[in-house]
A protein has these predicted regions:
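Solvent-exposed adhesion/ligand-recognition segments of exported proteins
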Residues: 14-16
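Aromatic sugar-binding interfaces of carbohydrate-active proteins
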Residues: 194-303
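Right-handed parallel beta-helix
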Residues: 35, 40, 60-71, 91-107, ...
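Glycine-rich beta-solenoid repeat tracts in large extracellular/virion proteins
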Residues: 27-31, 49-58, 76-78, 85-91, ...
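C-terminal functional modules
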Residues: 258, 265-267, 271-375
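Extracellular beta-strand-rich solenoid/capping regions of secreted or surface-exposed proteins
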Residues: 3-10, 22-39, 46-65, 71-92
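Sequence termini and other peripheral, non-core segments
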Residues: 10, 150, 374-375
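Acidic glycine-/aspartate-rich tracts in secreted/extracellular proteins
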Residues: 18-21, 42-45, 235-238, 265-267
Length: 375
């Protein structure tokens, strides 16, 4: 019924009268019809958890809240070719993904993607034909599987923002135990990353990269990033010389960075930037953000860790065992990057529960309960 509701046409709100685990059986849900709200908060306990698949958004005007998406390797052999995102946008626009939980993807846990050069010959045309106006807020993005079934081998990845994506806001998320792409921004991206908590990144923390071989004869575009009020804490899997931000490849970067404390597990401050390139890309430091969202105020970094721990993830009023464990590992400085969901207990097993949805109890404009209860 979830798949049918998302494939329907016209403005619609998906509410849930049954809570439990939905096995996608390696068939991703592809949303191609716009004006969709998925209100996972309406489900009775234990909420909605998707396993063995993910969601691909290929449309516009979509809101997704309070889902847990845990694809897993599903027993596939290393490099077998089972490559699945938790949730990805592909050429989508006007999308909000808020207070969801993603883990155990074999590709990215959460990403915004699409074609690089569709629509014409100019950068503005390219930007209008890939993902844009995307907000990822207050999610838990954890335990991307490392040496699992992705054909390339190691692929524990948090978030990818693909080339030429614009008006992207990544705010208030918890990244934990992801080897790389604790936000990777590809060439020409315009994005704001604010107030995220990143724990135990492995080989890459934040990362900007324009790969010349992927751009061919197209003129390189300057990336524009605003990185404000993020907190990074190294952990058991973090390499000893990891910098906060790596700039890689050939493209130049306009960077506004402010109030981003980043420390290794032993208390050493991380180097702010590192460059990996055979052509030294230029990092131009800005005194103000070039693309700050209207009305948005970043919190000071001193408030971020407590706020993210309290707010991030699906149904924080009734977290599942996976999210409780992740948060405990963040608190205690423990845990590690994993290769298979079986290393941490495997797919969740939950009793199914049902409860009728009473429309009169809900404000349909905000999808919150009128009595103030969380669900």
């Amino acid at each position: 019924s979830l798949r049918v509701a998302q494939e329907a046409e016209g403005p619609r709100i998906v509410v849930c009268e049954v809570g439990g685990v939905i096995d996608l059986n390696r068939r991703d849900i592809r949303v191609t019809n716009p004006f969709l709200t998925i209100a996972g908060q309406t489900a009775p306990e234990p909420g909605i958890t998707l396993i063995r698949g993910g969601i691909s958004l290929r449309t516009h005007d979509v809101i997704v809240r309070h889902l847990r998406i845990r694809p897993g390797a599903d027993g596939a052999a290393p490099k077998w070719g089972w490559e699945v995102d938790g949730l990805t946008t592909s050429g989508a626009h006007d999308v909000i993904v808020d207070q969801c939980s993603f883990s155990w993807a074999t590709d990215e846990n959460l990403s915004a993607s699409g074609p690089r050069f569709d629509g014409g010959d100019t950068a503005e045309q390219w930007r209008q034909h890939t993902s844009r106006r995307i907000t990822f807020s207050r999610n838990i993005v954890s335990e991307g599987l490392s040496n699992a079934s992705h054909a390339k081998g190691e692929h524990s990845k948090g978030t990818l923002i693909h080339d030429n994506a614009t008006q992207v806001l990544i705010v208030g998320n918890l990244y934990a135990h992801d080897h790389e792409r604790n936000q990777l921004f590809k060439g020409g991206v315009h994005a704001v990353s604010a107030n995220n908590l990143i724990y135990n990144p492995g080989n890459r923390c934040m990362h900007y990269a324009l790969n010349a071989s992927e751009w061919g004869a197209h003129p390189w575009q300057v990336g524009q990033l605003s990185i404000v009020g993020n907190v990074v804490r190294g952990g058991p899997s973090t390499r000893a010389d990891l910098p906060f931000l790596i700039v890689e490849g050939q493209g130049d970067l306009d960077l506004y960075a402010l109030d981003n404390p980043a420390r290794h597990a032993d208390g050493r401050a991380m180097q702010e930037t590192g460059i990996i390139s055979d052509r030294e890309p230029k990092i131009r430091r800005l005194n103000a953000s070039p693309h700050w969202p209207a009305g948005f105020r970043a919190r000071p970094s001193s408030e971020v860790e407590a706020w993210v721990k309290a707010e991030a993830g699906a149904r924080p009023w009734a977290r599942d065992a996976v999210d409780r464990r992740i948060l405990q590992e963040v608190r205690t400085g423990t845990g590690r990057i994993i290769d298979d969901e079986a290393e941490v207990g495997g797919y969740p097993v939950m009793d199914e529960a049902s409860r009728p949805f009473v429309e009169a109890d809900w404000d349909l404009a905000t999808m919150t309960r009128k009595d103030g209860a969380p669900s």
